[in-house]
From Swiss-Prot:
Localization in the cell: Nucleus
Region span, Disordered: 1-40, 122-221, 284-330
Coiled coil: 81-107, 363-389
Taxonomy of the source species: Eukaryota, Viridiplantae, Streptophyta, Embryophyta, Tracheophyta
Residue interval(s) of motif Nuclear localization signal: 175-182
Keyword Phosphoprotein attributed: yes
Organism: Arabidopsis thaliana (Mouse-ear cress)
Boundaries of every ENT domain copy: 50-137
Modified residues (Phosphoserine): S390
MF (Gene Ontology): chromatin binding; nucleosome binding
Role: Probably involved in the regulation of chromatin states. Contributes to basal immunity.
Keywords in alphabetical order: Coiled coil, Nucleus, Phosphoprotein, Plant defense
Protein name: Protein EMSY-LIKE 3
GO cellular component: nucleus
GO biological process, one term: defense response to fungus
């Protein structure tokens, strides 16, 4: 291209013409000479991906809460249901997503294992109660007759309280004979503690002991201790566990053959026992009567099973002598020795004393009095039957 000769005047007219076809008029060049044209498509894609990730996190949080609730219990309470509803709003979980997440939680392997473990655990916990409640054929008849006397027995003195911690409750194997004190390896039946199945008020069974704590309810450091006491019948030591304490009477509950079919118990004033008649596992607390001769403090009274002892001093082992050969079913017929029955009025005074501190309902007190009178009649009837059995067996000798 030819240009006119420059006259070198130094003006702009002397410069060659510029070519402006390379860039658009409105384009703004960047530092590298290229226009910055922003594309909105990549930004929209990134935004959608972030929203998706956020919602996934929300679903994971919602699913975790469902798993936690299912792990706690299969039944959802109203409080949890309300909380789940609020979380669905806050975490933007739709109904369809809720159903899908709930289905995943129910199918989760860990939740399934927890559910099976909970079901098996509940079955195991219910089995011991069923065993305790199932009476054996040999004694089912006597237990039916004992219900009335057992319900009132706890009003006066109450059975020993099962307030022991599970670790303090000795098992049946732990109560087998052969402990520190001398004596036979196996204990013969405590005949003075056993009653025939003829209607005499029997001791509360294991189920009653578990569900009906004693009236004393006072803590004593001796509760849970294991002792061996000597019986005057055979001069042998027998193992027992202290399970309760009555501070009003100053008596401790001694349970023999605990958690077994032969379980028996009595209320005892340990201070009235000669040191030679009681031995302790571990350190001797030193509360037994100092001095005296063996057997001191035992007395000749009889304890009504499940009820209070008589007002005479001494232990709950009475002077009953009921030693007879066992029958074919293993339950021996007892011969009558000597039975003392606590007067009904005395029991009524004990009941009034117990209820007086808690302002009982007068109707309930009257009901208790009626049952106590029935209790006495049942005892008298049982004694008459025992005399008949004794006379019949004496004639066969």
């Amino acid at each position: 291209m030819d240009y006119r000769p420059s006259d070198s005047s130094g003006t702009d007219d002397d410069l060659p013409p510029s070519h402006q076809g390379r860039y658009q008029r409105n384009a703004r060049p960047t530092g590298n000479g290229r226009p910055s044209v922003l594309n909105s498509a990549p930004l929209s894609r990134v935004h959608n991906e972030m929203e998706t990730q956020i919602h996934l996190i929300e679903q994971e949080a919602y699913s975790s809460i469902l798993r936690a609730f299912k792990a706690q219990s299969d039944a959802i309470t109203w409080e949890k249901e309300s909380l789940i509803t609020e979380l669905r709003k806050e975490l933007r979980v739709s109904d369809e997503e809720h159903r899908e997440l709930l289905s995943r939680v129910n199918a989760d392997e860990m939740i399934r294992r927890i559910r099976e473990w909970r079901k098996a655990n509940s079955l195991q916990s219910s089995v011991p109660q069923l065993v305790h409640d199932a009476p054996s054929p040999a004694v089912s008849g006597s237990r039916k007759k004992q219900k009335t006397s057992q319900s009132i027995a706890s009003l006066a003195m109450g059975p020993p309280s099962p307030s022991l911690h599970p670790s303090m409750q000795p098992s049946s194997s732990a109560l087998r004979r052969g402990g520190p004190p001398p004596g036979p390896k196996t204990k013969k039946p405590k005949t003075s503690m056993q009653y025939p199945s003829t209607g005499i008020a029997g001791r509360p069974q294991a189920g009653a002991l578990t569900n009906e704590p004693g009236e004393s309810g006072s803590y004593d450091p001796l509760v849970g201790r294991k002792v061996w006491t000597k019986w005057p019948d055979d001069n042998q030591y027998y193992e027992a566990v202290i399970t309760d304490y009555n501070p009003v009477e100053g008596r401790h509950a001694l349970v023999y053959d605990i958690n077994s079919a032969n379980e028996t118990w009595e209320w005892v004033n340990l201070k009235e026992i000669s040191p030679g008649d009681i031995r302790w596992e571990g350190e001797d607390p030193g509360i037994s009567r100092k001095g005296g001769h063996p057997g001191q403090g035992r007395g000749t009274k009889t304890m009504a099973r499940g009820g209070p002892a008589s007002n005479a001093g001494g232990r709950g082992r009475g002077s009953m002598r009921m030693q007879q050969p066992k029958t074919q079913n293993g339950i021996g017929k007892k011969a009558l020795g000597e039975i003392e029955i606590l007067h009904t009025e005395t029991l009524l005074k004990e009941v009034e004393k117990v209820f007086g501190s808690v302002n009982p309902n007068p109707a309930e007190v009257e009901k208790a009095k009626r049952v106590l009178r029935d209790h006495e009649l049942a005892l008298m009837d049982a004694i008459a039957k025992l005399e008949e059995i004794s006379d019949g067996e004496s004639g066969n000798i």
